Amino acid sequence: VAPPPNGSWFRIVDYPPGFPGRRHKTDTIDYAICMSGEINMELDDGIMVHMKAGDVLVQRGTVHSWINKGDETCRIAFILIDAESVGLPHE
């Protein structure tokens, strides 16, 4: 769910062990703060970004999915800030 125009959302999401991920794109500037556990963010070109507790990731308009291959729940705090859509080559 996108934030309102010129607005933002803050949410905390728990990804259980074995979470398979769901590819999606957000039209926002996203800050992801890994609070506990570990997780991989897979980009549409296959690049994997591994995050562990304390790591921070910033992205804008990427196609991605969150995949928890670990044996513990990963908790991530997200801050999503409304932004203009970024056109990607395959759109």
Predicted regions and their residues:
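Short acidic-glycine-tyrosine-enriched beta hairpin
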Residues: D45-T62
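Conserved short histidine dyad/triad with adjacent acidic residue
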Residues: S8-D27, R60-V63, D82
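Glycine- and acidic-residue-biased ligand/ion/polar-headgroup-sensing regions
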Residues: D27-D45
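Compact, glycine-rich, soluble single-domain proteins
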Residues: V1-A2
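Short beta-strand His + acidic residue motifs that chelate non-heme Fe in jelly-roll/DSBH
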Residues: G21-R23, M41-E42, H64-G70
